[in-house]
């Protein structure tokens, strides 16, 4: 009798992707974040769906509909906070996943890497639009400030901003379209994630050593299914600790004040996961320059395969490159901290130095370090 798992057209796809998939025997916990991102996405779609059942995307009722969800809907508060903090967990997993790719040279899988960068942009766009929906002070002013950046584009900028707003300011039309986009984008993300996996399975997974693991493969199930379940349990534990004990820890108190176009908050800032990019944006005195730096801070990831000068793929056996990688990690934490501070001395100069350091590390120092390591090994 033929095994349905291997003969049924649909089950065959699942089998080849999650059950009989040959996987390297030595992949560490850093390889768990892909599955965790999948879990985060499913969680966000489900909680978001239930929130959308009670939310109204109208400027007059949006804020009160969110309050209504928290106060009157059965377990509405937990759904709302799981969705808000789920986004934070999503970005923690995303940054870890990208960092893993950089450290172990996974960017040499060109298609997988580039789709990953597109996914990162899409998730960032989705999160930004979601932050606007509760229509609090920070929602409104965050939307105003960030969309206004497009006016820096020469010639078409102003028209483009007004077209996105659907008027001459952030208003009802803006909120409605942001809700529509926020609803559809996660499904586009899911589709892109499938393509991401498709390209990954063309080559097979990388591993910590960066060398071919063709001679030593193990089946994905049960080894990595069990490992992924452990990762998922730890993720859910962390999320629920956040939701049940400190739901507003990562939020902004200003968002508990309804949006008021006549009163600007003293300090406009995005959610914590955008602070590093926001710091780079506002520390460049020129508007267009700031916008370009903001886009390049993420787009620079696409250059990673071109900047790979080492004869080895992974950083596992490259101490100098490791050193620069962890300096980059510390630099990103510094930028995140600066993004949350006021634009005043000494934060301005610290931020400018950290911004220069960010681009310098990726574009110059890490490729040079790789060349030095090649020479030291007489390659």
Curated annotation (Swiss-Prot):
Biological process, per Gene Ontology: mitochondrial electron transport, ubiquinol to cytochrome c
Residue sites binding a ubiquinone per the record: 201
Required cofactor(s): heme b
Further details from the record: Heme 1 (or BL or b562) is low-potential and absorbs at about 562 nm, and heme 2 (or BH or b566) is high-potential and absorbs at about 566 nm.
Source species taxonomy: Eukaryota, Metazoa, Chordata, Craniata, Vertebrata
GO molecular function, one term: metal ion binding
Identification of the protein by name: Cytochrome b
Record's function text: Component of the ubiquinol-cytochrome c reductase complex (complex III or cytochrome b-c1 complex) that is part of the mitochondrial respiratory chain. The b-c1 complex mediates electron transfer from ubiquinol to cytochrome c. Contributes to the generation of a proton gradient across the mitochondrial membrane that is then used for ATP synthesis.
Keyword match Electron transport: yes
UniProt topology in membrane: Multi-pass membrane protein
Free-text remark on how the cofactor is bound: Binds 2 heme b groups non-covalently.
Binding of heme b b566, residues: 97, 196
Keyword Membrane: yes
Location within or outside the cell: Mitochondrion inner membrane
Keywords, in A-Z order: Electron transport, Heme, Iron, Membrane, Metal-binding, Mitochondrion, Mitochondrion inner membrane, Respiratory chain, Transmembrane, Transmembrane helix, Transport, Ubiquinone
Organism: Taurotragus derbianus
Disulfide bridge map: none
Similarity annotation: Belongs to the cytochrome b family.
Binding site for heme b b562: 83, 182
PANTHER family linked: CYTOCHROME B
Pfam families: Cytochrom_B_C, Cytochrome_B
InterPro entries named among the record's database cross-references: Cyt_b/b6_C (IPR005798), Cyt_b/b6_C_sf (IPR036150), Cyt_b/b6_N (IPR005797), Cytb/b6-like_sf (IPR027387), Cytochrome_b (IPR030689), Cytochrome_b_C_euk/bac (IPR048260), Cytochrome_b_N_euk/bac (IPR048259), Di-haem_cyt_TM (IPR016174)
Quaternary structure (record): The cytochrome bc1 complex contains 11 subunits: 3 respiratory subunits (MT-CYB, CYC1 and UQCRFS1), 2 core proteins (UQCRC1 and UQCRC2) and 6 low-molecular weight proteins (UQCRH/QCR6, UQCRB/QCR7, UQCRQ/QCR8, UQCR10/QCR9, UQCR11/QCR10 and a cleavage product of UQCRFS1). This cytochrome bc1 complex then forms a dimer.
Positions of transmembrane segments: 33-53, 77-98, 113-133, 178-198, 226-246, 288-308, 320-340, 347-367
GO cellular component: mitochondrial inner membrane; respiratory chain complex III
């Amino acid at each position: 009798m033929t095994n349905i798992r291997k003969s049924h057209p649909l089950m065959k796809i699942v089998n080849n992707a999650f059950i009989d998939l040959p996987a390297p025997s030595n992949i560490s916990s850093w390889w768990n974040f892909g599955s965790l991102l999948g879990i985060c996405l499913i969680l966000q779609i489900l909680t978001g769906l239930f929130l959308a059942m009670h939310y109204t995307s109208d400027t007059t009722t949006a804020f009160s509909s969110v309050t209504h969800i928290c106060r009157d809907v059965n377990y509405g508060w937990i759904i709302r906070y799981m969705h808000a903090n789920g986004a934070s967990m999503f970005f923690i997993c995303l940054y870890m996943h990208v960092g893993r790719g950089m450290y172990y040279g996974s960017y040499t899988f060109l298609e997988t890497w580039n789709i990953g960068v597109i996914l990162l942009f899409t998730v960032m766009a989705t999160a930004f639009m979601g932050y606007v929906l509760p229509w609090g002070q920070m929602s409104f002013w965050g939307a105003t400030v960030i969309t206004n950046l497009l006016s820096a584009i020469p010639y078409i900028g102003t028209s483009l901003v007004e077209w996105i707003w659907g008027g001459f300011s952030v208003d009802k039309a803006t909120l409605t379209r942001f809700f529509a986009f926020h609803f559809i984008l996660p499904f586009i993300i899911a589709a892109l994630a499938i393509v991401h996996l498709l390209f990954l399975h063309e080559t097979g997974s990388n591993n910590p050593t960066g060398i071919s693991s063709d001679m030593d493969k193990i089946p994905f199930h049960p080894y990595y299914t069990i490992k992924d379940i452990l990762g998922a349990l730890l993720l859910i534990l962390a999320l629920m600790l956040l939701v049940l004990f400190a739901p507003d820890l990562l939020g902004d108190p200003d968002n508990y004040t309804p949006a008021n176009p006549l009163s600007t908050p003293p300090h406009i800032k995005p959610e914590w996961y955008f602070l590093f990019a926001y710091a780079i944006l506002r520390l460049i005195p020129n508007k267009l320059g700031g916008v370009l730096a903001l886009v390049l801070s993420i787009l620079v990831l696409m250059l990673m395969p071109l900047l790979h000068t080492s004869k080895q793929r992974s950083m596992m056996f490259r101490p100098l490159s490791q050193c620069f990688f962890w300096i980059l990690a510390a630099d990103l934490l510094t930028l995140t901290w600066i993004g949350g501070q006021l634009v005043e001395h000494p934060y301005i100069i610290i931020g400018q130095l950290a911004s220069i350091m960010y681009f310098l590390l990726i574009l110059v120092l890490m490729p040079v370090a790789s060349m030095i390591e090649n020479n030291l090994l007489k390659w």
